[in-house]
C-alpha cells in the first residue's frame, strides 16, 4: 500500500509540477489567439479578424472570421451586408480618395452606390473615376453561426503580409446604401511542419503495438496477486466523510449556486460570449475541466451535480416510486439528446450564446425536477441526462472502483438494504445492486450503500485503469453503440474548430443538392448536418464491418456473430473517444480559460459595489501551444495503447485459443490505428477558439 500510495502521490505531484515547468520552458509571454489587437474602428463600428493567428498557407481554402461590433450598443452587429476582399499589398497601387466628403451621383454599376467613409491613410483600396470606392473583386461575406461573425473565403497560397479589405453596407438616406470602408492587416504564415510530429506519431503507434503485446505477455505469465488491494475506506477520515449525511449537500451547494449564477448572467449580461462569464464558466472551464475528472475519479462529478441533486430531492419530497417502462431503461434517450445538443451547437453555436446557454441549463433543471416528481430516485440521471451515458462510459477508465469485498457475504445477506434502503440510508439512487455491479458506469460514490450495509462489505480501492472494458460480464448494445459513435462525434467536434473546416464544407456542398442556395450560411449548416449524422451512423457501421471480417477470419463460429462481436468489441473504442474529447478541450481550457479572469473582474465591477481592478482582456495562456500540441499527441497515443490492449484482452476472452485470438482482433487493431492517425492529423491543423 505504501508503494502504491507513493506512486499515485508522485504521479499527481509530477503532473502539477510538470505543467507550469513546460509552460515556462516554452515562454509564457504570448497571448491568447485572437486577442492581440483592437482591429480597425470606422465610425461606431469595430472590425477584427477573429482567427488571424491561425492563418497558414495550405492547398485548400479556409475562412477568415471577421467580427463586426457596434460600439454604441456594445454588441456584435448581426444581419449586416458585408463585402470583403483578401489582398496582397504589393499587388496594388495606392490611390488617394477624391476630395470632398460627398461624391457626385453616378450610374457606375460595378459597385453599390451611396455615401462612403474614407479608409485610413496608406490604404490600398481602389477608387473609381466617379469618386466612389471600386468594389469589383469583393465577395459577399455571409454571417456564420455566431451573430456578428462573417466568413470570408480565402485561398492562402502565398506566405507574407496580406490585407483584408472590408465594405460594410448600411441603409442610406436614399435608395443606395451607405458604404463604410476599412482594411485589416494579417499574416499568412508557413504551416507548422507535420513531418516531425507525424513520424513521431507513426513510430509511437508502432511502439504501442509492441507495448500492448508485451503487456499481454506479462499479464498472462505473472502469478496472480495473493492479497486484495488496499481498501481506501480503511482510512478513518475518508470512511467518516463518505458516510456523513453532509457528504453530498456540502459538495452540491457550491455548484448549485454556480449554476444559478450562470443562468442569471446568461440572461442579464452582455450577449457577447467572450465577455460573458456564463459561457466561459459553462463551456470553457466546466465542460473542458469535468472531462478530466472522468479519468481520475470516474463518475464523481455526479455526486456534486446540482441538476441530479434537484431530481433526487424532488423525488424524495414527492415520494414517487414509479419507474420508467422497461423498454425505456436504456441509454438510447440520453444518447439521442447528447447527439442532438452536439449537433445543435455546430448548427446554431449554442456555446457562443449566453442567452441560449442559460435557457438550456434552466431546461435541464426543469426536466430533472419534473422527472423527480414522477419517477423514483435519480431516474433522470440514469436514463435521460444527455451527458450521463458519456460519463458512464468514460468512468470505466478510472483507476478507482467501489465494489463488494466478498460476493459470498452479499449472497448470504437476505435484506439487500444497499438497494432497498433502511433507516441508516437510502437505496442506491442509480438503481445499482452492488452484488452484481461489475463496472463504474453508474456508481458515483454517493455513499448510501456504505451507510446501509450492516456487514461493511464494501471497498473503495485502486485498480487497473480501464479494467471494466474487458472484465465486465454484462454488455449492452446501447453502450457499445455510444462508445463507437462518440469517436465520430468527438472527431466532428474537433473538426468543426479547425481552420480548414469551412473550406471542406464549401467543397462538399458543391456536390450536394442544396449547392445552388443563395444563403451560403444555410448551405453550410445543411452540409454540417448531413456530415454530422452520417458520421454518427457510418463509424458504427464500419466497426460492425470490422466485426464481420473478424468473424470470417475466425471460421464463422456458430456461438458468435458480427452483432455479438460489435457489442463486445465496441467497448475497446472508449479510450479513443475519451482521448479525442480531452485533446480537443485542452486548447479551450488552457488558451481560452485565462479569459475568465478579466471577465470575472468585469462582472464583479459591473454587478457589485466592489471594484477589483481593470480587466485585461489580453491574458497569457496557462500553457503554450507547443506544450498543448505535445500533450494532445501523448493523450491520443496513450488512448491508442489502451484501445489496442483492450481489443486484445477482449479477443482472448472471446476466442481463447491463441491461433484464433491472434487472427480475430486484427480488423479492430487496424481500425483503431487508422482512427488514431486521422485524429492526430486533425489536431495538427490550426484550431480556432470558441470565444475569440
Q: Which functions belong to the PLM regions below?
A:
Residues 1-11:
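Bacterial N-terminal signal peptides that target proteins for export
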Residues 10-19:
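Bacterial N-terminal signal peptides
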Residues 25-203:
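N-terminal soluble domains immediately following signal/targeting peptides that reside
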Residues 27-29, 372, 440:
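Residue-level marker of alpha-helix boundaries and capping positions
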Residues 189-412, 416, 426-432, 447-451, ...:
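Membrane-embedded alpha-helical bundles of multi-pass integral membrane proteins
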Residues 418-421:
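Membrane-interface module
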Residues 441-445:
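Aromatic- and glycine-enriched pocket-lining scaffold segments that form the walls
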Amino acid at each position: 500500500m505504501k508503494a502504491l500510495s507513493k506512486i499515485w502521490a508522485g504521479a499527481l505531484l509530477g503532473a502539477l509540477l510538470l505543467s507550469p515547468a513546460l509552460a515556462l520552458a516554452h515562454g509564457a509571454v504570448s497571448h491568447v489567439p485572437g486577442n492581440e489587437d483592437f482591429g480597425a474602428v470606422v465610425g461606431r463600428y469595430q472590425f477584427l479578424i477573429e482567427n488571424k493567428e491561425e492563418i497558414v498557407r495550405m492547398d485548400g481554402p479556409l475562412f477568415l472570421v471577421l467580427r463586426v461590433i457596434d460600439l454604441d450598443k456594445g454588441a456584435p452587429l448581426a444581419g449586416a451586408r458585408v463585402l470583403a476582399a483578401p489582398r496582397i499589398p504589393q499587388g496594388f497601387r495606392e490611390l488617394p480618395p477624391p476630395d470632398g466628403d460627398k461624391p457626385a451621383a453616378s450610374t457606375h454599376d460595378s459597385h453599390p452606390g451611396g455615401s462612403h467613409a474614407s479608409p485610413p491613410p496608406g490604404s490600398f483600396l481602389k477608387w473609381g473615376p466617379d469618386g466612389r470606392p471600386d468594389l469589383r473583386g469583393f465577395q459577399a461575406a455571409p454571417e456564420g453561426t455566431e451573430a456578428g461573425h462573417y466568413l470570408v473565403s480565402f485561398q492562402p497560397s502565398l506566405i507574407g503580409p496580406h490585407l483584408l479589405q472590408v465594405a460594410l453596407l448600411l441603409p442610406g438616406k436614399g435608395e443606395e446604401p451607405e458604404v463604410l470602408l476599412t482594411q485589416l492587416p494579417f499574416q499568412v504564415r508557413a504551416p507548422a511542419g507535420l513531418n516531425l510530429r507525424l513520424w513521431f506519431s507513426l513510430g509511437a503507434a508502432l511502439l504501442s503495438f509492441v507495448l500492448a503485446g508485451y503487456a499481454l505477455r506479462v499479464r498472462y505469465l505473472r502469478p496472480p496477486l495473493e492479497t486484495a488491494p488496499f481498501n481506501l475506506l480503511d482510512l478513518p477520515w475518508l470512511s467518516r466523510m463518505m458516510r456523513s449525511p453532509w457528504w453530498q449537500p456540502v459538495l452540491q451547494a457550491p455548484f448549485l449556486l454556480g449554476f444559478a449564477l450562470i443562468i442569471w448572467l446568461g440572461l442579464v449580461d452582455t450577449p457577447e460570449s467572450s465577455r460573458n462569464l456564463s459561457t466561459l464558466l459553462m463551456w470553457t472551464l466546466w465542460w473542458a475541466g469535468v472531462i478530466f475528472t472522468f479519468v481520475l475519479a470516474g463518475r464523481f462529478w455526479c455526486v456534486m451535480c446540482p441538476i441530479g441533486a434537484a431530481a433526487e430531492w424532488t423525488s424524495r419530497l414527492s415520494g414517487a416510486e414509479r419507474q420508467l417502462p422497461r423498454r425505456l431503461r436504456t441509454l438510447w434517450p440520453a444518447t439521442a439528446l447528447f447527439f442532438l445538443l452536439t449537433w445543435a451547437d455546430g448548427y446554431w453555436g449554442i456555446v457562443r450564446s449566453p442567452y441560449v446557454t442559460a435557457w438550456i441549463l434552466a431546461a435541464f433543471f426543469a426536466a430533472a425536477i419534473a422527472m423527480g416528481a414522477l419517477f423514483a430516485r435519480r431516474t433522470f440521471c440514469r436514463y435521460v441526462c444527455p451527458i450521463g451515458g458519456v460519463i458512464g462510459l468514460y468512468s470505466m477508465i478510472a483507476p478507482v472502483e467501489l465494489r463488494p469485498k466478498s460476493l459470498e457475504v452479499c449472497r448470504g445477506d437476505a435484506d439487500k438494504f444497499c438497494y432497498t434502503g433502511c433507516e441508516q440510508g437510502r437505496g442506491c439512487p442509480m438503481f445499482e445492486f452492488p452484488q452484481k455491479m461489475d463496472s463504474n458506469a453508474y456508481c458515483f460514490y454517493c455513499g448510501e450503500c456504505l451507510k446501509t450495509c450492516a456487514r461493511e462489505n464494501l471497498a473503495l480501492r485502486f485498480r487497473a485503469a480501464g479494467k471494466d472494458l474487458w472484465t465486465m460480464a454484462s454488455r449492452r448494445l446501447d453502450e457499445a453503440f455510444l462508445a463507437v459513435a462518440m469517436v465520430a462525434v468527438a472527431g466532428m467536434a474537433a473538426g468543426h474548430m479547425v481552420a480548414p473546416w469551412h473550406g471542406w464544407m464549401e467543397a462538399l456542398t458543391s456536390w450536394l443538392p442544396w449547392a445552388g442556395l443563395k444563403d451560403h450560411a444555410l448551405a453550410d449548416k445543411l452540409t454540417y448536418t448531413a456530415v454530422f449524422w452520417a458520421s454518427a451512423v457510418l463509424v458504427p457501421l464500419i466497426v460492425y464491418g470490422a466485426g464481420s471480417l473478424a468473424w470470417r477470419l475466425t471460421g464463422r463460429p456458430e456461438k458468435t456473430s458480427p452483432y455479438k462481436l460489435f457489442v463486445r468489441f465496441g467497448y475497446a473504442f472508449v479510450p479513443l473517444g475519451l482521448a479525442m474529447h480531452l485533446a480537443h478541450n485542452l486548447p479551450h481550457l488552457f488558451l481560452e480559460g485565462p479569459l475568465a479572469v478579466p471577465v470575472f473582474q468585469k462582472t464583479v465591477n459591473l454587478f457589485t459595489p466592489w471594484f477589483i481592478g481593470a480587466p485585461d482582456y489580453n491574458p497569457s495562456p496557462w500553457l503554450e501551444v507547443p506544450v498543448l500540441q505535445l500533450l494532445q499527441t501523448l493523450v491520443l497515443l496513450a488512448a491508442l495503447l489502451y484501445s489496442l490492449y483492450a481489443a486484445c484482452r477482449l479477443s482472448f476472452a472471446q476466442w481463447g485459443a491463441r491461433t484464433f485470438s491472434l487472427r480475430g482482433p486484427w480488423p479492430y487493431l487496424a481500425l483503431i490505428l487508422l482512427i488514431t492517425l486521422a485524429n492526430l492529423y486533425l489536431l495538427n491543423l490550426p484550431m480556432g477558439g470558441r470565444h475569440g
